[in-house]
Amino acid sequence: MPSPAQDSAATMAGKNGHSLISTEKFRQLYHTLIASQLLNEQLRSAGKPAAIPHREAGPAGFVLDLRPEDIVLLPSPTHFAHRVKGTPLKPILAQPATASKTTLTRRLADAVAVSLNNKIEKNNAIVLTLFDLGGNAEASLSAYDEIFAIAVANQLPILFVLDSRASFADSLEFKETHAALPYITVDAYDIVAVYRVAQESIVRTRGGGGPALIELASCGGGEENPVDKMHRYLGTKGLPANKWRSEATRRFAKELQAACHLQSDPLA
C-alpha cells in the first residue's frame, strides 16, 4: 500500500493553488513544447544524440520555471532541455555527433554531491536529474538504492525525474523500500499535468521537504504527440492554439537560422 508521501499526480496538482495556470503561462508552455520538439527533430536529423521522439513534455514542463541557480543534470550535452534551461542553440548544435553521455550512476551521484553542497551552503537551490532505465522492463531502480537512501536520509533538495518508457519490474518493491520518498506518476505526454506536478514538487523540495521521484509514464492510450495533445486541450479552453503554434514555429526557425549562421561564421 502506498505511503501518504507517495501521492498521486492529481492530488499534487491541486495543492497550494498551483492548479490555476494563466493564459500567458499556457502560451509559454506551448511555445516551449513546440520549440523542444523542433530542436529534438533537428538534432536527430543531424545525427546527434537526441531524446526519444514525443518525450519532450516531461523535461520541458519540469525545467521551464527552474531558477538560474538550480542545476539540471541531463543524459547528454545535446539534450533539448538545455535550451529550456537557458543555454543558447549555438553551443548545443555545435556538440559533436559523438558527444559523450554520462552514466546513470555518475549522474545520480553528482546529483547527491551537488545537492549536499547546496544544503550546506543554504543557497536555496535545487538539483533536477533526468534519467531513464533504457526502456528495459527488467531494469531495476533498486540498483541505486544507496543513492536514494542517502538523498532521503539527508533530506537533500533533489528531484529525480524518471523518463519511464516501460514499466520496470520492481516498482512496488522500490516504493516499499523507500516509503519516505514521495513517488509521483504523471502522464509523459501531457505538459500541463507535468507542469502542475513540477510546481508542487519544486516548492516542496525547495522548502526543505527533501527529495522526490517523479515518473514520466505512458498513461492510458500509450504514445501520443504531446504537441497535438496540448493543441486539443487549448482548443477546449478557447485559447488561440493555431496562432500560438505558428508563432512558436516561426520563432524557432528564426532562432535556428541565427544559430546556424553563427556556427558558420569564423568570427562568431
Region locations from a protein language model:
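Cofactor-binding active-site loop characterized by glycine-rich and histidine/acidic residues
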Residues: 38-153, 173, 178-180
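Phosphate-binding glycine-rich loops and adjacent basic patches that engage nucleotide phosphates
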Residues: 2-8, 21-32, 104-111, 141-147, ...
